[in-house]
Amino acid sequence: MRQSTLRRAAVLAAFALASFAASAAQVDVAGVKLDEAIDVHGSKLQLNGAGVRYKAVFRVYTAGLYLGKKAGTPEEVLAAPGAKRVTITMLRDIDANELGKLFTRGVEDNSPKNEMSQLIPGLLRMSGIFSEQKQLRTGETFTIDWVPGSGTIISVKGVPQGEPIKEQAFFNALVRIWLGPSPADWKLKDALLGKS
């Protein structure tokens, strides 16, 4: 009897410890759980920062930025070697076409004018991906990965969408939507850089 009580207590303690470890490995951002460490195509990445994108008073999505090592400036993020990920989880339903247009405008507002002609093929592909989705619903996630040797991989609900976009300039242009000189949301920029 005493042995089964000890065994039961040990099992409960192990379960509690495992639950604590699992919760310690995540960050809660507006009810969305983001892992502090992830694996992207064989590369170990850590959460650099995460926050919420607001439009007026409305929460639109959470965003998380993953890198191989911490970076505190946009320049450090763009120059960081290896794989990178931006993860977006919707906090409200949104027309996917509208989101695609906002991303395109964000790229235009934050990219050097002499780079825009190089970015057009990637922007057209991204617009096509969002057009096919029609609607992104609350809780749905998409990721934008930079994988050296492959390119930018956009996944919606965990499913890669088409072939990678090879040019790193395209991934950098997308990152500048949030970290550029005219970011989508200044507070989100600071959060992604780990400043909040």
Annotated model-derived regions:
Residues 2-11:
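Bacterial N-terminal signal peptides that target proteins for export
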Residues 156-159:
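Short strand-turn-strand beta-turns centered on an Asx-Gly dipeptide
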Residues 25-80:
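N-terminal secretory signal peptides
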Residues 163-188:
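Flexible glycine-rich active-site/ligand-binding loops centered on an Asp-His dyad
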Residues 186-196:
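Cysteine/selenocysteine-centered motifs that mediate thiol-based redox chemistry or coordinate metal-sulfur cofactors
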Residues 71-149:
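Mid-length scaffold segments of soluble, non-membrane domains
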Residues 19-22:
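N-terminal signal peptide c-region/cleavage motif recognized by signal peptidases
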